[in-house]
Amino acid sequence: SYKVESKKELSLDDCLIMESLHKENAESKKLSYALKANQIYKLCKASNIEVFFLKLENKFIAARIISIEENISYDIFACNSFKSRLDGATQFLMQYIFDYLKNQNIQYFDFSRIPLGRKGAYGVYEFKKSTRGKLLQYNSEWVFFKNKKLRHLYYLYNLIINKKDFY
């Protein structure tokens, strides 16, 4: 049976597991990027980041990195092995995360970043639809800032200099 572990602090070994899981994910989805353990480690140092690991028979088969800001949570990265695509493992992990967030009084979960119409993303879009949440279309890139002042400055720069609104 499946077992979920939630972590707010990661070891480098945890990050190596995630790197390996994401490598399988990138291979199956033909992603143009790969997550590296040292990058994951740096990202997960932020106080608002939580990681959920899914195990089957004591073997890691999936992981999910999320960010929590007040009452909104954001999906950052999914690291799914080939095995996690079987028998609803990914759905099990997401249901666990949704229940966990609900118990923490987090009202929203934003899957982010993968828009409708992106080549090869139809399966992801269908998975998002199956959660029965509200569908929102983004009109720009997803950007993460540790410093909220920098986020606002970036927004103003895009609005005034680039003449585009990134929200």
Label each region the model flagged.
Residues 1-84, 100:
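A conserved beta-strand-loop-helix scaffold within acyl/acetyltransferase catalytic domains
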Residues 33-34, 91, 118:
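Short alpha-helix boundary/capping motifs
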Residues 36-37, 94, 121:
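Amphipathic coiled-coil/heptad-repeat helices and related helical stalk/stem segments
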Residues 41, 95-99, 126-129:
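Surface-exposed alpha-helical segments enriched in charged/polar residues
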Residues 80-88, 115-118:
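Short, contiguous acidic/charged loop-to-helix segments that flank catalytic cores in large enzymes
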Residues 85-99:
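Conserved acetyl-CoA-binding loop-helix of GNAT-fold acetyltransferases
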Residues 104-167:
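Active-site/acyl-donor-binding loops of N-acyltransferases
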